[in-house]
Every structure is written in structure tokens, then in C-alpha cells.
Amino acid sequence: MGKGKNHDRKANPGFGKVKSKSGTSTGEFTLKRVKGENFYRDAKSASRVKMLNGGKAVRDRDGKIVEAAAFQKGEKEAEPGRVKPDRRWFGNTRVISQSALDHFRTALKEQKADPYSVLLKRNKLPMGLLQDDTKDGGRRPHIVETEPFGNTFGPKAQRKRPRLDIGSIEELGESSAASAAAAAAETATAESQGNGTADLADIYHPTTSTAREPIYAKGTSRRIWGELYKVLDSSDVVIHVLDARDPLGTRCKPVVEYLRKEKAHKHLVYVLNKVDLVPTWVTARWVKHLSLSAPTIAFHASINNSFGKGSLIQLLRQFSVLHSDKKQISVGFIGYPNTGKSSIINTLKKKKVCTVAPIPGETKVWQYITLMRRIYLIDCPGIVPVSAKDSDTDTVLKGVVRVENLATPAEHIPALLERVRPEYLERTYGLEHVEGGWHGEEGATFVLTAIAKKSGKLLKGGEPDQEAAAKMVLNDWIRGKVPFFVAPPTKPESGADAHVSSATTEKVQEQEQKELAEEKETKEMLEEQERSLGKVLGIKRVKGVEQPISKIVTMTKFLGDDARRYVEEEEVDVDDVDKEMAEEDEDEDEDDDDDVEESGEDQEEEELAWDDVFPEEAAGVDAADGEEVEEDDEEEEGDEDDEDVPSAKQLGKRKAIDSDEEEQTAIKAKRMTTNKQKASNFYTHANVKNRNRDRKVPKNPGKRSRGDDEPTGKKAKKRR
């Protein structure tokens, strides 16, 4: 058998080279080897054995370490030493006196109580020692854990006398009598003031029946509260949405206390929604009252005609600036059912991203919505805190329960009649005037019978259907068709409860004016100091949130004494504020607006006015002005669509308009140069389904010189 050419080593000089298991091609007699590599182990297996045996010290037969392991200290390094006798080694490194500690504790307490101060950086201090909760009614010390009973009493007692607050039976009786007298005095004070059933309920704590119908337990399930805690844990800013008609009644006090104690690093903001259903002075008073505990913003949720949108977005931008170390912040919306949480999110996004309905319980699970590149919104289902003070009727009147699911809705009408003025019911349902109004079950029966007959809610035999009428009244109550609001906590200075003389009233008004003037001067001085400090340090000043509450359009018509207005403080001119901030915020970053359809920073000035939405009901002069502006806009759009070459009159008119726009761009140059579309109401200038045919718009004499209805432009040429 012959040999092939591959068998000849001389003909094939590379025959002796083989590829090792380690991946390197080496010759048979190469000198380059890895440590540990021999005939039995290649380089890879040698390194594996070294890994398994490594990290251990090498010892001899007696157990003494011959070679120390890697990163192991030798015995010589731990020789006995002697510390130099110096006071600096054994003295206290940081010493503080008790007076300085008390001063720091007081300042810390004041800053923590301030809702407008934000903790940006936490110092490494023993905060548990600085916060004295036992003095201010906080948690009691666990005395059983610190001093057990066996170590205090009995044969194994470690002290001679136990620490007891009461030493005898007489002292125990005196303390109980004093507490009972204090409770009786508090009750008598509440009854004498006559603040209503809510304050008395706080004192007496009425109990509710344990066997309640399941429909009255809406918003209290474990699933709903699980969704709430998901939102609270995921949010950096928590917005509590309140109903402007009853803010304190729709406030979840346990959730607020939980945020104060357990989640103090999260920011709480109150949003007073549905401000169009109450008078403006009520909104102003509630905003002033709630601002003492947390930042409060008045809001009206509407995609086309909202109020407070710019202020809320501006506040959220301030929080995003404070948390500049985070990539984004999350804003959670919580509150009672049917308070408008999802509607506020739709208003901020200017489109329907959350399902909304005028009935409670529409939102079932939480939902994430992107507002900006750095701001996310979280929608939460409505929650109802379990309280012994709320009866079934209170739950229904707060809008928690769906009215159509109530078995006996007529039983809640007597409480409704106590909260609504009779004049509003007469005006809403066309009832006959009754001196003194309606009270109790008899009054409720009379009202429901009259409403059922008037609306055609009848049973067999012509009997009025009181349950159907009660459902209709409750639905109107929840949707705001029946005027109602809870008066803010103020001093009664007018009306039937006012017994103060005119001289005293004038003195009080003068004193209030002086206080307001002093507050204004102090505020201006602080603002000047902030501006000067910002210029020195090179820090950009954050624009404050201002709201013209007097410009809120109220949909409900109130009577004279309910619609009264008080001048809380002097209104700040919005244009002046915009001028100042335009000079200071020229270098403002616009990256946050990349993913926003409507930023809303100056939305208050661009929102529709009442004249644009309802031109027929507006005043004559204002309506005429608004219609002229609309006519100009319509004619400009028509010129762009129909004519290629504008006439001389049109050029002159456009120059005048351009000059006006240049004056506005001097104030808000950055806003006017963007390509964002302004809000406009389609139904004010369009004849939808021929319903707007009778609307007469004042014609501009400089626009058309010939017939009133004669068309111009390309369309006219085509018709000819």
C-alpha cells in the first residue's frame, strides 16, 4: 500500500504543528508554556486547578502557614501596639449645647410645618433624637417594652418607686372629672356657635349600623385601596382633587395624615375642581383657607374652556425643576369618586386619554399618562375613607354612589332639602313658593310629588312616582344643576348672623387693609431680595403661580346674598407679571415641551372668554368687540383660501394687524413664534346643522364694497 503525499513530512513542513485545546496553535517543541502546563494538563485545565486551589494558605505538616493566601494579612502586621495618650483620641468630636439643640429643633419644626418649603438635601443627623414626638401628642413610648412589669413590680423590681402619674384614688377621680368637664365645655361651645351637624358629629361620634347595604360601601374595597397605594408609592407629587362645593367633605383625611407621617418626602397639592359651580368669593376663601396646609389651585376641567390649566402645569414644572436629579417625576391624582380626576388629566392633555362619565366609579384601575418628557400623570380610582361620622345619606350626597342603583332614593331627599335653599328648588323645578321652605319627610313628599307630576313620572292610576323623581333630583344635585355650596370658615360679618355695628365693621376693614398693605410690602421686599440673590449666584428664578380668581365664569346663577363678593387682596395684573417674567426667563429651556400638545404655561390669557362661547348672552359692548375680532379672523382665513393676490385695502388691514401683533410679541415673543394652535370654539363661527343661521356678525365696511352677500375671489369667478 503506497504512502500519500501527506505522509511525507519533508514534503509537508507544517505537518508537525497541532492546535492545542486552549485555542493556540503551537509547535511540538515550542518553549512558550503556561505555568502549570505539563504533559497531563494543558493551559486551560491548569488555570482551572489554580482557581480551585487558590485563596488558601499553604501550611506545613504542623499546621503553620508557610505561604499566606492572597489578600491575607500576615501575623507580623498585627503586633501589639500602644495608643498615644492624647485627649483628642478620647474626647468628643462634636459637641453642641442644649440651647443650640432646642433652637435647631424649633427651626426644624417650623420648616417641616411649612407646606411651601421643600427639603432638597437631607443631612446625616440623628433625626429621631431631634424630633420630640412625645411632647406634641405623638406616639406614646412603649413603656411595657422599655420597663417590663416584672422589672418594675414584685421581688425582682430594679427600682424602689414606680413612676406613676396618679398616686391615689382621689387624684384618679379628679383627673376623670376634669376630662369630662372639658368635653362638656367643648360640646356646649359647638352648640352655641351653631356650626351645623358636622361639628357636632365630630364630638359625639355617632355609630353606623354594622349591617349596611353593599352599595354604600363603594370605594372602600381592598382592591380600590390597593390601587391607591400603588399610585402613592409611584408618585413624587400627589394631587388631591377636591369638590369646590364641599372641599372638607371630599378630603380624604386619613390619606393626608398618612402622607404627612409616613411619606413626608412626597409633595401634596390640593386642586379645587368644579369652581364654575360656586361663586367666586367662595372659591377665593376656600383657596385661602386650604393654602395654609398645602398649595391649592382653583381649577375648572374642560378641554376647550378650562381655568387653572396654566397654573397647574407651571406648578408641576416647578416640582420638576426641584427634582432635577431625576429623569422624570410622576404626579398622582387621588380623591373621592366623581370629583374630576380623569377630567383634569384630559384637560392637561387637551384630548380624551381617560374615560370620564358624570357618574362615580368610571375609573377602575390606575393608568399612566405622559404629559411631558419629564412629567408623567397617574390616574387613580376614587376612594372613600371609612368614617363613623358619615351616614348613608352623606355618602349619597357626596356623589359616591350611583343613584340608579339605589333601592330607596327618596329617603335621602329630606337631608338634601336641609342643605339647599328653597328658592333654588323653586327656580330649578318650577315649584310654587312656600313660606319657610320644606322640611322633614312631609316636605320631601310634597316636593317629590310636585316634581313627579310636573315631569310626568307617574305610576298606574296616575300616582306620582316619588322614587323616580328622587333619582332625578339626586342626579341634578350631583351634576351641579341644583345650586349648593358649603360656606368657607369665615367670620360672619354680613347677613342675618351679623350683629356688629357699622363703626366696628369699619375699624375691622381698616385694620384688614393695613395688614394687607404690610403683607404686600413684605412680599415685594422678599421678591427683590430673591432676585438680587439669584443674580449674584446665577440661579434662575422660578416663576410664581398667580390665578385671577375673579375671572372665573360661574355657570350657576346664585341669589344676591350668595353671590356677594369680598375683596380678599388686590389683584395682580397678569400682563405686568408676564412682562417681568419674560425679561427674567428668556433663557428658559424648551426641551420639556417636545412631547406636549399644549404646554399651557400662559394658557390663562389664551383661553376662550365667555363672549366667544356664548355671544348672545354677553354684554353688548363686549360681544361686539369679540365678534369684530372673530370677523377679522374669518376674513383673513377666507382671503388665504380664496384669493391669491390680496388687494390694497387688505394689505393695509394686514399691516395694521401685523403692527398689533408686533406689540404683543414684545411681551411674549417666545410664545407667539411657536407653531402651536390657539384654542378656538368651532360652534361660534360655523353653521352646524343650520342652527346658527340667525347669528348676525357685524360686517367690516372696508372688506366688501359691493353687495352684502356677493362672493369675491376665485369662487365668484367660477360662479359667473
UniProtKB/Swiss-Prot annotation:
Subcellular location per the Swiss-Prot or TrEMBL entry: Nucleus, Nucleolus
One Pfam family recorded for the sequence: MMR_HSR1
Gene Ontology process terms (BP): ribosome biogenesis
Gene Ontology terms: cellular component: nucleolus
InterPro entries given in the database record: G_CP_dom, GNL2_CP_dom, GTP-bd, GTP-bd_ortho_bundle_sf, NOG2_N_dom, P-loop_NTPase, TRAFAC_YlqF/YawG_RiboMat
Keywords linked to the UniProt accession: GTP-binding, Nucleotide-binding, Nucleus, Ribosome biogenesis
Superkingdom of origin: Eukaryota
Domain CP-type G: 225-386
PROSITE patterns assigned to the protein according to its UniProt record, in alphabetical order: G_CP
Residues bound to GTP: G335, Y336, P337, N338, T339, G340, K341, S342, D379, C380, P381, G382, I383
Biased composition (Acidic residues): 568-615, 624-645
Biased composition (Basic residues): 688-704
Biased composition, class Basic and acidic residues, residue ranges: 132-145, 507-527
Coiled coil regions in record: none
Main subcellular location of this protein, as a coarse class: nucleus
Comp. bias intervals (Polar residues): 674-687
Region (Disordered): 1-27, 130-162, 488-527, 568-720
Molecular function as annotated in GO: GTP binding
Protein function: GTPase that associates with pre-60S ribosomal subunits in the nucleolus and is required for their nuclear export and maturation.
Note: The C.neoformans mating-type locus is unique, spans >100 kb, and contains more than 20 genes. MAT-encoded products include homologs of regulators of sexual development in other fungi, pheromone and pheromone receptors, divergent components of a MAP kinase cascade, and other proteins with no obvious function in mating.
The family this protein is said to belong to: Belongs to the TRAFAC class YlqF/YawG GTPase family. NOG2 subfamily.
Protein's name in the database: Nucleolar GTP-binding protein 2
Native species: Cryptococcus neoformans var. grubii serotype A (strain H99 / ATCC 208821 / CBS 10515 / FGSC 9487) (Filobasidiella neoformans var. grubii)
